[in-house]
Amino acid sequence: MAEPSQAPTPAPAAQPRPLQSPAPAPTPTPAPSPASAPIPTPTPAPAPAPAAAPAGSTGTGGPGVGSGGAGSGGDPARPGLSQQQRASQRKAQVRGLPRAKKLEKLGVFSACKANETCKCNGWKNPKPPTAPRMDLQQPAANLSELCRSCEHPLADHVSHLENVSEDEINRLLGMVVDVENLFMSVHKEEDTDTKQVYFYLFKLLRKCILQMTRPVVEGSLGSPPFEKPNIEQGVLNFVQYKFSHLAPRERQTMFELSKMFLLCLNYWKLETPAQFRQRSQAEDVATYKVNYTRWLCYCHVPQSCDSLPRYETTHVFGRSLLRSIFTVTRRQLLEKFRVEKDKLVPEKRTLILTHFPKFLSMLEEEIYGANSPIWESGFTMPPSEGTQLVPRPASVSAAVVPSTPIFSPSMGGGSNSSLSLDSAGAEPMPGEKRTLPENLTLEDAKRLRVMGDIPMELVNEVMLTITDPAAMLGPETSLLSANAARDETARLEERRGIIEFHVIGNSLTPKANRRVLLWLVGLQNVFSHQLPRMPKEYIARLVFDPKHKTLALIKDGRVIGGICFRMFPTQGFTEIVFCAVTSNEQVKGYGTHLMNHLKEYHIKHNILYFLTYADEYAIGYFKKQGFSKDIKVPKSRYLGYIKDYEGATLMECELNPRIPYTELSHIIKKQKEIIKKLIERKQAQIRKVYPGLSCFKEGVRQIPVESVPGIRETGWKPLGKEKGKELKDPDQLYTTLKNLLAQIKSHPSAWPFMEPVKKSEAPDYYEVIRFPIDLKTMTERLRSRYYVTRKLFVADLQRVIANCREYNPPDSEYCRCASALEKFFYFKLKEGGLIDK
């Protein structure tokens, strides 16, 4: 390829067309000459390759991450540090040239001014270098040397630069290097849409060199920022909204995870609109194209072409772009960290592999949730949520900050923590934290225990143990273990790329591609073979019906199973029509993993009910997947919509949008391991040894477990004796709790607990109290339907009292109010049948 600086240059009249919002554009002629090709309306694509980089080199994903999305090789706008350094070194090299050599390089991009009739728009060296990048080694051309094109001297091309400062000359030379890089990228880039955007930027920078102006991307794309609040503000709001009630150290952990996520986004390579189109609905593609083009022009390309103004992705984009990219970016991020986990130090490994996935899952709820407050422009938290920590004054009541449950168990949820029973010594001074008195009994201590107080350090220590093979002694666990989850094999095969899942369907406009059609034929064959009583023509009609979709399971390039379904968004449910896995691939967990993927797909589309008619052989499978014969969807919503099968049973499955179904069995397994280790540690703390049982020598054959000495002190509780009556109907539970809370708030002793504690009254309250709560926050939680069981409600009431007693001296007015209120609400709980009398 010819040296870019010696390539034919565009005429001064050729202005770059303002960059428009992406729209269908004619496909340009392959590999056009950047100097003469017309500028089509650009659409987004990956970024260019540096002129100095070898062909086929790829960009990295930024610090600690990998590139998301595919792109062609060699990419300066998505550079790793080495590529950025190459561009910087090239510019430093050019700026260090003698002035005569600088004028020669700028003359290549400067129109001839010998006379008005000369249309030459760039000086052509009569002795061009024999190889690219050899121009810097050649001696500077004389100002009298004639242009190979117009035969006017170089001086006529650079006369306008005679009185220009050295700084301005260097700025123009920086644009020259960027133009050369973009020139190479236009020719190397294979994606048509990408080529168009680079070509536009190439022309824009050439025009700016010619006119000695600064580049400004014009058109209907708008100017940064494009959304408010931006991604960074939304994520920081999320951390404050979800984790502000944590202890400072744990809150800092969440903050570090958020900064790591934002850093990854700023250096992440987005997928092209063509790739996005394959997994999204048509109406979303146009919006994504606009955002993608903005990202290319304002964030991606300027990373190495610093002549263009650069903005951070998380500073100029908001919820719209994040919704488009989050699911793909999250999967690629976690996979990248999983592959490179051995390179991480143990502390970071626990943080990233254990806490980061849950952090992203919770963030996902706020990104796709309909009423998340973190995206409101005026988002604020009560003043009590500040993180400033200073010495505390006299005693104050307990209070809380609004929050929702966080990582469990890894972030502090779960078992009760042990309380110190050391002597408290003298009466605590004002401002001094109380310890438990010497004569406190075990029953008294139990009253102060509140669920969710496992120290973060203990959880991290347990997590390191269960993830360290050397520390986990005992029999080797494997996929052959009797305790392995049904979908464990399928999940591992998916991670290794052995199997793939694709949601596909027939399409008439545009016509489905050949690969999709072949997969649909394969699905038709699988369903026909596995469902012999179903007419083949009927199966073919539904599989190829554009209104139906199929989640296809692909192994070694061929279809081995799938679930055919039809979505009814207006009715709020989906009908599952066919579900089958080829016979020689069964009993491997593929069916369970298929259904879990289907559940997550529907959660993303906000459809939370499945309906299906199951024959006698399929009822067992559907029961294992959470289906029930108890139909909650009103008959009026599905009557006339779904197909009725003779001899089949209608079954329903309600989806929980908070559950990551494809990882659920893995999460439960980890939770069991954590609880088991915590129990082992608890057992090690119990020093008391009881004598052996002598009753068996006297002929007694068995005794109740609760009569074993010391069994209750270990925390054991009898099974099947659930205290209180659990209300199944959510509306009935809501009404009961609402009335109870209103009575508690109207009690004369409730006044200290009505509002969150103000930091002006107790500056260190949130340092001492790790899980604050108050009646105002309980009212907000009740209104948002947070209390799905009575246990959650009772636990918050208990914590109100426990926090007050932990913070304040026992003879304070606040503790007296707490005791009076405690007696009252326990009386009301018993009266309402919520606990045993």
UniProtKB/Swiss-Prot annotation:
Consequence of changing Y645A: Reduced histone succinylation without affecting histone acetylation. Reduced gene expression
Residues where acetyl-CoA binds: C579, A580, V581, Q586, V587, K588, G589, Y590, G591, T592, Y617
Position(s), cross-link Glycyl lysine isopeptide (Lys-Gly) (interchain with G-Cter in SUMO2): K728, K759, K791
Residue(s) carrying Phosphothreonine: T735
Residue numbers annotated as active site: E575 (proton donor/acceptor)
SUPFAM superfamilies (alphabetical): Acyl-CoA N-acyltransferases (Nat) (SSF55729), Bromodomain (SSF47370)
The protein's Enzyme Commission number: 2.3.1.48, 2.3.1.-
Entry keywords, A to Z: Acetylation, Acyltransferase, Bromodomain, Chromosome, Cytoplasm, Cytoskeleton, Host-virus interaction, Isopeptide bond, Nucleus, Phosphoprotein, Transcription, Transcription regulation, Transferase, Ubl conjugation
Spans annotated as Loop 3: 639-648
Compositionally biased residues, Low complexity: 75-87, 416-425
Modified-residue entries (N-acetylalanine), positions: A2
Residue ranges constituting the N-acetyltransferase domain according to the UniProt record: 503-656
Reactions this protein catalyses: L-lysyl-[histone] + acetyl-CoA = N(6)-acetyl-L-lysyl-[histone] + CoA + H(+); L-lysyl-[protein] + acetyl-CoA = N(6)-acetyl-L-lysyl-[protein] + CoA + H(+); succinyl-CoA + L-lysyl-[protein] = N(6)-succinyl-L-lysyl-[protein] + CoA + H(+); glutaryl-CoA + L-lysyl-[protein] = N(6)-glutaryl-L-lysyl-[protein] + CoA + H(+)
GO MF term set: chromatin binding; DNA-binding transcription factor binding; histone acetyltransferase activity; histone deacetylase binding; histone glutaryltransferase activity; histone H3 acetyltransferase activity; histone H3K18 acetyltransferase activity; histone H3K9 acetyltransferase activity
Subcellular location per the Swiss-Prot or TrEMBL entry: Nucleus; Chromosome; Cytoplasm, Cytoskeleton, Microtubule organizing center, Centrosome
Post-translational modification: Acetylated at Lys-549, inhibiting the protein acetyltransferase activity. Deacetylation at Lys-549 by SIRT6 promotes phosphorylation at Ser-307 and Thr-735 and subsequent activation of the protein acetyltransferase activity, leading to acetylation and inactivation of PPARGC1A.
Effect of M567A: Reduced ability to acetylate and inhibit PPARGC1A
Pro residues composition bias: residue spans: 7-51
Recorded consequence of changing Y601F: Reduced ability to acetylate and inhibit PPARGC1A
The family this protein is said to belong to: Belongs to the acetyltransferase family. GCN5 subfamily.
Annotated domain remarks: Loop3 is required for substrate specificity and adopts different structural conformations in succinyl-CoA-bound and acetyl-CoA-bound forms. Tyr-645 has an important role in the selective binding of succinyl-CoA over acetyl-CoA.
UniProt protein name: Histone acetyltransferase KAT2A
Annotated organism of origin: Homo sapiens
Gene transcribed to yield this protein: KAT2A
